[in-house]
Amino acid sequence: LNIDGRVAYTGGFNVADEYINRKMRFGVWKDAGVRITGPSVLNMTSMFLQIWYAVTGDGSDFRSFIRENEELPAKEGFVQAFSDMPLDDEAVGENVYADLISHAQKYIYIYTPYLVLDSYLTQALCQAGRSGIDVRIVTPGIPDKKIVYLLTRSNYGELLEAGARIFEYTPGFIHSKCM
């Protein structure tokens, strides 16, 4: 969600009664999102427009959607927005996650409804666990997609052997995707 190029929200929020716990299909629904202001909103706008153009072919002049960055007070840290889409062969998301995992010094905490890992990320997490990094993963204990739930659980063994700790959220469904 991008509002006037000033504020952006990103996360796993869906729109339906079950996602605001009005209707309880899987128990209490847990999700996470982030509100972004500052220069990264421009990145979020650009990512949206790239996907918009790829899907619609709309070649309009999008300059009106791009706001000039305002001078902001210096702060410690930064936000780097990135997108990973099926329209190219780049594994941006996987590379970002692998880099974050390999540079962890104390802990790696992951919330995910769908722990579907390839060997590259599995090995990165296992190496972190074996090197003494506190690796904790929270997945749903109540599945919304049974096949994906079984696939998620099939990844547990190797991770547990490497020292990761895995928790299943049982009061409902955890839809958060956070690391």
Task: Report the location of each language-model feature.
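Charged, low-complexity intrinsically disordered terminal segments
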Residues: 1-179
